[in-house]
């Protein structure tokens, strides 16, 4: 197969995003829709961040930075890793969102015929990124039981905690088992920590802290984080990744230089301002989303696949009401004006669970969210829409 043909086949292997499909329908319907299909925060980003972005533009701070980003921002980001897990700033890369960071990491570790391990219930873009990197996906149910999926072709393990869409928070035992397995098998562990500031039960376990106990050359964890969630900077597209070793950082730099050139300079100055805000914004944002989660659990508890212990979403089990959640979500949008994300894209292709699932956002305005839940319950014919 020619290179062009191979690239064409790779593109065709990427599933169409069910999230973008419902998003297009919402845009067509108009602003009166209760949009609970997408993770858009009600809490706005700090005013100091807005001012820092505008000031950077006004002062002409719009030239290229180095591919890994502003040195002062990389240094500040390295300091956000607790204890012995802190990387050197030279191994921290500023990226246009955590999504691009994960894509770049996968491209930097991929090889011909390689395999990446993904959670069975996963963010659809993770699967798209794996396929785009030319890797083959395999899916795991338990991050503490990975040996049955092992083969020499496995090069990456993606872990997402708190998880999108389920809200599952992996405990210390599960994270330790996944890390030990990856270190023993020499598999790169990609830790998607986008929702690190939204843990409602237990304490977040961080693979990088475990990695720090290994000799420098044996470390395997890429820690990926974002400003989109805690700091409410979704449209700014600002994230970062810490590479496990100097060699991995050199290879990641090649990918970024070839695909990115450099992150947005004004946005990086906005990121510095966000970090200078301290924890007050993060604490208030966490409290708001958690209170919304509690109310959604009270209203819709029987529909939840499980109570989300973290993150911005709840995964609904609608299998008693439909065998086609895509159709149900379209009908819910048309008849009740409520958008939720159909579940097909959150599980492996062809998984029979997908048509019975849907994802509901918890991070939007509380009263609007609760009204959306009431409409959903009424639409399903339940009597407890309260």
Predicted stretch roles:
Residues 8-99, 104, 274-277, 383-386:
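N-terminal small-domain helix-loop-helix segment of the aminotransferase-like
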Residues 29, 133, 184-185, 336, ...:
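Helix C-cap/helix->beta junction micro-motif
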Residues 35, 224, 304-309:
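Short beta-strand
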Residues 61-180, 197-215, 384:
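Conserved core of the PLP fold type I
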Residues 79, 86, 331-340, 346-386:
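PLP-dependent enzyme catalytic core of the Aspartate aminotransferase-like
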Residues 118, 139, 191, 340-342:
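Hydrophobic residues in well-ordered beta-strands that form the structural core
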Residues 214-290, 379-380:
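Conserved core segment of the aminotransferase class I/II
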Residues 272, 288-297, 305-318, 356:
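Conserved glycine-rich beta-strand-loop-beta hairpin in the small C-terminal domain of fold type I
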């Amino acid at each position: 197969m020619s290179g062009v043909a191979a690239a064409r086949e790779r593109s065709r292997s990427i599933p169409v995003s069910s999230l973008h499909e419902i998003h297009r329908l919402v845009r067509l319907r108009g602003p009166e829709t209760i949009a609970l299909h997408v993770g858009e925060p009600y809490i706005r980003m700090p005013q100091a961040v807005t001012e820092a972005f505008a000031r950077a533009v006004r002062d002409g701070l719009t030239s290229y930075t180095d591919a890994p980003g502003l040195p002062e921002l990389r240094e500040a980001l390295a300091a956000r890793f607790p204890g012995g897990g802190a990387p050197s700033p030279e191994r921290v890369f500023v990226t246009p969102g955590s999504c691009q960071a994960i894509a770049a990491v996968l491209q930097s570790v991929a090889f011909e015929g390689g395999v990446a391990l993904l959670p069975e219930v996963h963010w659809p873009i993770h699967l798209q990124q794996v396929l785009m990197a030319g890797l083959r996906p395999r899916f795991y149910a338990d991050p503490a039981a990975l040996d049955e999926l092992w083969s020499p072709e496995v090069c990456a393990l993606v872990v997402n905690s708190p998880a999108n869409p389920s809200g599952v928070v992996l405990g210390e035992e599960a994270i330790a088992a996944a890390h030990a397995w990856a270190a023993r098998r020499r598999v790169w562990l990609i830790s998607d920590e986008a929702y690190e500031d939204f843990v409602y039960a237990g304490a977040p376990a961080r693979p990088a802290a475990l990695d720090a106990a290994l000799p420098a050359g044996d470390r395997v964890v890429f820690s990926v984080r974002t400003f989109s969630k805690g700091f409410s900077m979704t449209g700014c597209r600002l994230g970062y990744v810490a590479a496990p070793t100097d060699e991995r950082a050199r290879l990641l730099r090649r990918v970024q230089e070839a695909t990115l050139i450099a992150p947005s300079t004004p946005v990086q100055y906005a990121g510095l301002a966000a970090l200078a805000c301290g924890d007050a914004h993060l604490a208030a944002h966490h409290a708001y989303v958690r209170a919304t989660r509690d109310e959604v659990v009270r209203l819709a508890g029987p529909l939840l696949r499980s109570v989300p212990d973290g993150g911005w979403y709840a995964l609904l089990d609608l299998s008693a009401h439909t065998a086609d959640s895509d159709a149900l979500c379209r009908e819910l949008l048309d008849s009740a004006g409520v958008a939720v994300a159909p579940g097909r894209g959150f599980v492996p292709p062809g998984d029979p669970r997908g048509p019975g699932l849907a994802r509901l956002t918890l991070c939007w305005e509380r009263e609007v969210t609760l009204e959306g839940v009431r409409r959903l319950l009424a639409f399903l014919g339940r009597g407890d829409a309260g």
